Swiss-Prot record:
NCBIfam families: thiL (TIGR01379). GO terms for biological process: thiamine biosynthetic process; thiamine diphosphate biosynthetic process. It comes from Nitrosopumilus maritimus (strain SCM1). This is Thiamine-monophosphate kinase. ATP binds at residues 114-115, 138, 205. GO terms for molecular function: ATP binding; magnesium ion binding; thiamine-phosphate kinase activity. The gene is thiL. Mg(2+) 2 binds at residues 39, 67. Catalyzes the ATP-dependent phosphorylation of thiamine-monophosphate (TMP) to form thiamine-pyrophosphate (TPP), the active form of vitamin B1.
Amino acid sequence: MSKLDESEIIKIFQRKLGNKNSEDVEIFKLKQNIIAKTDTLVQSTDIPPKMKLGEAARKSVVACVSDFAAKGVKPQYGIISINFPSNISRSKVEEAATGFRKACSEFGISILGGDTNAGKEIVFNVCLFGSAEKIVPRNGSESKDLIFATGPFGYTGAGLSILLYKKKGKREFVAKAIKAVTHPKPRVDFGVKNKRYFTSSMDSSDGLSTTLNEMAKQSKKKFVINNSPHKKDLGEFAKSNQDNLVFHGGEEYEFVFTINPKHKKTILKNAKSLRTPIIEIGYVTTGKGVILQRDNKDIPLKDKGWKHFR
């Protein structure tokens, strides 16, 4: 690297993240079973225009934290690997390191170490670890279960259309949509507190339609969706494109969960106390696939979420 070499970048991250010494390996202690998740953020596909590098660093942590939230587990430790172009400036490295530090502080994560590389574009890889006796599965839903989602959905898709394609909207809505892209909020506290009531759950970052279809498939049940989890202002912005933003947009970092109806009152109470927005979107029944009920019609909801290499 011409302006900064690897050791200088490592020192910046160590200073920001509180790591004093480098080692060949890292040691940490967890009780119960180890829960792990890794995710990669690539500049060309995952960092939209106007997203700051610190926000991108936080997003790469959030991508993992969101999966922990869906499983009802709090992440405790992490490993971060970074790839920077050789001409990266010190200020950009500082900005990224600060973004990681703030994210780890926000979610209570201790960074153990990582790896540093040089390449054509910025790449962040994050691996997080936690512990739990068990996790909430994707395949546990039963007939007559209620389907809920933390939410609402569609703002991120709207924000991306504003940032990428310069779509216009009301000033207040545009600000809200862009914030959904640059500062997503995984629902960790809600997931941890309520996991005992979930029969199944799954993160929705690849798109709500993907999540619903995967959960229905793994549970060998039919998911009937009779309530779209969006707010009125999204409909005003999206018009005919509303369903695409809500069900296929992706990158919301919310999660879907199913519960026995007897736990509905408790779930709603806990959501209110934690200030977590949740929406009842449907129910589980016998059969297969996902059905969207609208205007007294059953419309198949296909998986059209985000997939790499498609």
